[in-house]
């Protein structure tokens, strides 16, 4: 895929930070993760210059929306599915907050002893 010797290929990307740019940055011309061959100077301008220079969050997101619209009109990719996951967590597990990235950081997780957990459930 990296050498662009394909007619169709399947690729995946899991966001590593919560921001639209995490996905939109994948399609800039010559970008290290742009294995599509997509190249558009207008798109690059929006992602590399306009969005970073936006004065407000709303303005930045409007630029991202415009870039995403351009990307979907040119359709260098065909989104097939999105990753989902569910977690069953025992009631004695504490300190495991949900997060948008669905990453499990177990650093601050602890198990409440069974006696305390049983009292809490009643």
List the predicted regions and their residue ranges:
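Detector for C-terminal structural segments
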Residues: 1-122
């Amino acid at each position: 895929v990296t050498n662009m010797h394909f007619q169709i290929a399947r690729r995946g990307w899991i966001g590593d930070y919560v921001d639209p740019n995490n996905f939109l940055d994948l399609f800039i011309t010559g970008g290290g993760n742009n294995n599509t061959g997509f190249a558009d100077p207008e798109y690059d301008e929006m992602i590399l210059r306009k969005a970073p220079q936006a004065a407000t969050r709303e303005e930045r997101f409007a630029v991202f929306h415009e870039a995403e619209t351009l990307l979907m009109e040119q359709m260098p990719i065909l989104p097939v599915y999105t990753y989902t996951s569910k977690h069953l967590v025992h009631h004695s597990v504490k300190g495991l907050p949900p997060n948008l990235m669905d990453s499990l950081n177990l650093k601050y997780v602890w198990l409440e002893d069974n006696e305390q957990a049983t009292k809490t459930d009643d």
